Regions:
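Domain-level signature for soluble enzymes in the chorismate/prephenate branch of the shikimate pathway
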Residues: 1-86
Length: 86
């Protein structure tokens, strides 16, 4: 594959990730609303740690673990920020 073909492949993946991101943030918004009604805090550190460990084990690529964990942590932060605005 040449550079342009690889970039097109990344573009397709980015489109798929965008759709998944929109779905995830919609669910996150609903979780934020439910937490508000239930009087629960937005932040659940134990759950975040559990997810990080579970995903780390499932990733199957030790080289990518620190990058994927950084990605997830940023995603958690964005979700919490979004929930604060609900």
């Amino acid at each position: 594959m040449n550079l342009n073909e690889l970039r097109k492949e990344i573009d397709v993946i980015d489109e798929q990730m965008m759709e998944l991101f929109k779905k995830r943030m919609s669910v996150s918004k609903n979780i934020g609303k439910l937490k508000k009604v239930m009087g629960l805090p937005i932040i659940d550190n134990a759950r975040e740690e559990m997810i990080l460990e579970k995903r780390k084990a499932a990733l199957g690529n030790d080289e990518l673990i620190p990058y994927y964990q950084a990605f997830l942590i940023k995603l958690f932060d964005l979700s919490k920020e979004y929930q604060h605005h609900v």
